[in-house]
């Protein structure tokens, strides 16, 4: 696959510009070319994000870098090939070599990515962030780094520790700090202030609603495997209707453009 570096750089710049504190970039995560097309045709869609959990599940693997990096990159490539929007990829913890993984993701058409710390020492993960930044510069693009601290997801939900980690990652070259699990108004507001608005969160039925997160100044909101959950629930309900000898659902006729 030949990469148009100029077009890729423009997409990277557009992705970065879409991170707006108070008017957040909303990402409905995709896991294959089909789901990416469905999301891309939705009004207001500015970018496509992948979800590692969903891609792994679709390939029969558990989450957590159990899917080989080559298969993950191929899934990213297939997604980027069918949409004209910027693609930001969930690169888990970088597969042991964040620089090489980011370089491969860029070759696959991604212009941004998540890198999670899994509670590694902040200085260690900052090295991965710096390697990702260097990989983007070597490719001639501003690779948009969404650096994740797992303090709320896997740790003790310590606000000060999350802030310290996030600031370390920003200093290392991250563009936004992803804090999954941070859910109270007070904590979200504190994180927004600490990161000068460069806060990324994951939304769910249990989180604060989108409009409140926007009012608090969040810059980016994704749904992770939640979009796969929506699709699976629709398939489950349709299957139950058919297997009970019910009517053929009208939604069976839907096809995304180009599919």
Task: Please tell me what each predicted stretch does.
Residues 2-237:
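Alpha/beta enzyme core
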Residues 234-235, 239-241, 258-259:
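Ligand-binding clefts/hinges and TM-proximal coupling segments of bilobed small-molecule sensing domains
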Residues 244:
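Active-site-adjacent C-terminal substructures of enzyme catalytic domains
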Residues 249-259:
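A short, charged, Gly/Pro-tolerant segment at domain boundaries
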């Amino acid at each position: 696959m030949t990469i148009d570096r100029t077009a890729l750089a423009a997409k990277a710049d557009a992705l970065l510009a879409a991170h707006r504190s108070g008017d957040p970039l909303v990402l409905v995560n995709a896991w294959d070319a089909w789901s990416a097309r469905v999301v891309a045709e939705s009004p207001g869609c500015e970018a496509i994000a992948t979800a590692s959990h969903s891609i792994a599940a679709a390939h029969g693997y558990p989450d957590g870098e159990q899917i080989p990096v080559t298969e993950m990159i191929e899934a990213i490539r297939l997604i980027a090939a069918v949409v004209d929007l910027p693609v930001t990829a969930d690169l888990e913890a970088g597969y042991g070599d964040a620089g090489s993984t980011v370089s491969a993701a860029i070759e696959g058409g991604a212009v941004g990515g998540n890198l999670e710390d899994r509670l590694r020492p902040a200085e260690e993960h900052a090295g991965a962030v710096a390697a990702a930044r260097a990989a983007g510069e070597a490719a001639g693009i501003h690779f948009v780094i969404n650096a994740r601290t797992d303090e709320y997801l896997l740790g003790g939900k310590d606000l000060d520790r999350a802030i310290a980690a996030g600031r370390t990652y920003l200093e290392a070259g991250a563009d936004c700090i992803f804090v999954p699990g941070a859910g109270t108004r007070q904590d979200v507001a504190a994180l927004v202030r600490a990161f000068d608005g460069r806060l990324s969160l994951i939304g769910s039925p249990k989180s604060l609603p989108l409009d409140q997160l926007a009012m608090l100044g969040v810059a980016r909101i994704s749904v992770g495997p939640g979009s796969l959950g929506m699709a699976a629930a629709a398939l489950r309900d349709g299957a139950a209707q058919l297997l009970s000898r019910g009517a053929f659902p009208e939604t069976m006729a839907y096809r995304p453009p180009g599919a």
